[in-house]
């Protein structure tokens, strides 16, 4: 069944509602067994936001290599903004079901009922399936996605960032993740926080999460024996950015020409067996802007 689904999805044809229900049930069985902080072996490729840009996801796999020849960590935000969140999620979930050890799918702030209702995914689902059943299948599944990944105990991957309420990775392991993303607290902060050139903490203008600075990152990496924190969540025009003097934090952004108009590049971060790092950049697919009729997008960058 998984092979049939993958063959269909690689042709960019959405699954039937019944097949989608089965896919989500199989994926849920896998996610239930995964921990809040999923351990991942190197070599691995770390990816940022996709936001429904299916043709650019296909370019990403061309750049990084097909699964199972390559292993991937995706740091969330698969839906909203772009035209093809359904196809993106179905393809990634089908790969997860077929090759569970070769792809890790983390939760992002858009893997939330409230956010993806407001920013396009709900409307896309009802347009493509004619009802909201698929919405229920997907959003139920979101509650089981891991919150973070740890590559060889040294590279910590999370969608947004850190929280003033924790200092260790082990504290993240204790969170009850099987719920809608809360409006505040550690779980919320991991999804919503951003770095900036400050020392410690300030309140985020997003209305959720925090802004964290170099001292916070230095302390978290030191306490937990980390070499690097990888996160996504923020558009960077060049596709990749190291933060702070110690370069112990980076943003990976994997949606080129975000919203089909930003003109930015995208990247993936390749981690080798010895944990050395290579950034590969890619630009948007010409097909991406013709993947669906234009629709109004909410002009606020979450």
Could you say what each language-model-derived stretch is?
Residues 1-302:
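Feature recognizes metal-dependent phosphohydrolase scaffolds
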């Amino acid at each position: 069944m998984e092979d049939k689904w993958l063959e269909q999805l690689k042709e960019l044809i959405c699954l039937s509602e019944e097949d989608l229900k089965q896919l989500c049930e199989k994926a849920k069985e896998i996610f239930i067994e995964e921990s809040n902080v999923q351990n991942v072996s190197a070599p691995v490729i770390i990816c940022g936001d996709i936001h429904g840009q299916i043709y650019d996801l296909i370019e990403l796999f061309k750049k990084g290599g097909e699964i199972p020849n390559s292993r991937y960590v995706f740091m969330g935000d698969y839906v909203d903004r772009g035209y093809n969140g359904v196809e993106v999620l179905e393809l990634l979930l089908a790969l997860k079901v077929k090759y569970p050890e070769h792809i890790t799918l983390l939760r992002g702030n858009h893997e939330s009922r409230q956010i993806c209702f407001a920013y396009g995914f709900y409307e896309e689902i009802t347009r493509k399936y004619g009802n909201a059943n698929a919405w229920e299948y997907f959003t139920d599944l979101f509650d089981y996605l891991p919150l973070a990944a740890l590559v060889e105990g040294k590279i910590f991957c999370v969608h947004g960032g850190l929280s003033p309420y924790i200092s260790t990775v082990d504290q993240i392991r204790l969170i009850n993740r099987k719920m809608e993303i809360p409006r505040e607290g550690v779980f919320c902060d991991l999804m919503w926080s951003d770095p900036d050139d400050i020392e410690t903490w300030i309140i985020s203008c997003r209305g959720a999460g925090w802004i964290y600075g170099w001292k916070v990152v230095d302390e978290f990496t030191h306490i937990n024996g980390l070499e690097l924190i990888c996160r996504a969540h923020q558009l960077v025009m060049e596709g990749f950015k190291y933060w702070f003097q110690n370069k112990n934090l980076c943003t990976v952004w994997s949606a080129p020409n975000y919203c089909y108009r930003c003109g930015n590049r995208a990247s993936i971060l390749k981690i080798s067996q010895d944990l050395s790092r290579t950034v590969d950049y890619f630009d948007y697919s010409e097909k991406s802007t013709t993947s669906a009729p234009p629709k109004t997008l909410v002009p606020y960058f979450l």
